[in-house]
From Swiss-Prot:
Name this protein carries in UniProt: Anthranilate phosphoribosyltransferase
Record-level GO BP terms: L-tryptophan biosynthetic process
GO cellular component terms, semicolon-separated: cytosol
Annotated function: Catalyzes the transfer of the phosphoribosyl group of 5-phosphorylribose-1-pyrophosphate (PRPP) to anthranilate to yield N-(5'-phosphoribosyl)-anthranilate (PRA).
Length: 329
């Protein structure tokens, strides 16, 4: 471990195995806080590599409480931290995708920068955040959707929480979280809040996932309706980079819905899910389209958008949310 820490201090990046060993030591409580802070700071200052994040994700998955999925499912998650104040589109898109035929094990936490993170929203609508692994697996199988609260499934992260709170910047664990789904899903829509993370997370996805879309939407960790979204698409270990425009979904540029209070955020989210707020509905449908594409429910983004809008306007999306809330209790 001393040699690994020295490599980091000298600005040298770690390979997957070294990063795995470092993460395992951190998550087991084997490193003191000073060493943990030094390692996380060195990685952040240099910029975390795909190999390092892959090693950390492997370790996090290994020690997680597992959801014993019996069917194939997807996840929609973002790194958060974009500070854009948008409603929680990844969660809403997951609900719409589930209502439209995908199976989704949504993994999330409380807010990183906005008013409502995934867990904040699900809790606000009455979902039981303490849903256990067997229950979550059953929900995905029977109703196509379950939300799993990250701290419930990653108790080892509590060991590094005090250090993370003391550091004035985001660390590798903010990148690891969205990739550490406890159901070990093989398909994901992943939003990143920094352009540099497109290739980093894309590299991790190439190793650990069968299919993924990694998206950076002009400053937000979602597919943007306001302008271009940079994408790394991973399929069978190969990565392709391209740009999505709103026109690829059959729409023009549309403002992303933003909120200034928690109450406004949840109100906008529910209005969008019911088709009662145009900007929110479009933003949710665009991100649901990307999720449906990853799940291979649709062949392209335009078809995905049309299916998502239809699902919202027929009331199926809101009914799916209420069904999940009831099933969680």
């Amino acid at each position: 471990m001393v040699n690994i820490l020295k490599k980091l201090a000298n600005g040298v990046s770690l390979n997957i195995d070294e990063a795995y060993l470092l993460s395992r030591e951190i998550l087991s409580g084997g490193l003191n806080d000073v060493a943990v802070a030094a390692a996380l700071t060195a990685m952040r200052c240099r910029g975390e590599t795909a190999e390092e994040v892959t090693g950390f994700v492997k370790s996090a998955r290994e020690v997680a409480v597992k959801v014993p999925l019996r069917v194939e499912a997807i996840d929609t998650a973002g790194t958060g931290g974009d500070g854009a104040g948008t409603i929680n589109l990844s969660t809403l898109a997951a609900v719409v995708a589930a209502a439209a035929g995908a199976r989704v094990l949504k993994h999330g936490n409380r807010s990183a920068s906005g008013f409502f993170g995934s867990a904040d929203f699900m809790e606000a609508v009455g979902y039981n955040l303490e849903v256990g692994p067997e229950k979550a697996a059953e929900m995905v199988e029977k109703i196509g959707f379950a939300f799993v609260f990250a701290p419930r499934y990653h108790p080892a992260f509590a060991k590094v929480a005090p250090v993370r709170r003391q550091l004035p910047f985001r660390t590798v664990f903010n990148i690891v979280g969205p990739l550490a789904n406890p159901g070990l899903v093989k398909r994901q829509l992943i939003g990143v809040s920094e352009r540099r993370l497109l290739d980093v997370v894309g590299g991790v996805a190439s190793v650990l996932l069968d299919r993924a879309l990694v998206v950076y939407g002009s400053g937000v960790d979602e597919v943007s309706t306001e302008g271009p979204t940079e994408v790394v698409e991973v399929r069978g270990g190969r990565a392709e980079r391209y740009v999505l425009e709103p026109e690829d979904f059959g729409i023009g540029k549309t403002p992303l819905p933003r909120a200034s209070t928690r109450e406004e955020a949840v109100g906008l989210a529910l209005a969008g899910l019911r088709g009662e707020h145009r900007e929110a509905e479009i933003a949710i449908a665009v991100n649901a389209a990307a999720a449906l594409y990853v799940a291979e429910v649709v062949r392209d983004f335009r078809d995905g958008f049309e299916l998502a809008v239809k699902t919202i306007r027929e009331g199926a999306a809101y009914r799916k949310l209420r069904e999940a809330v009831e099933a969680s209790r």
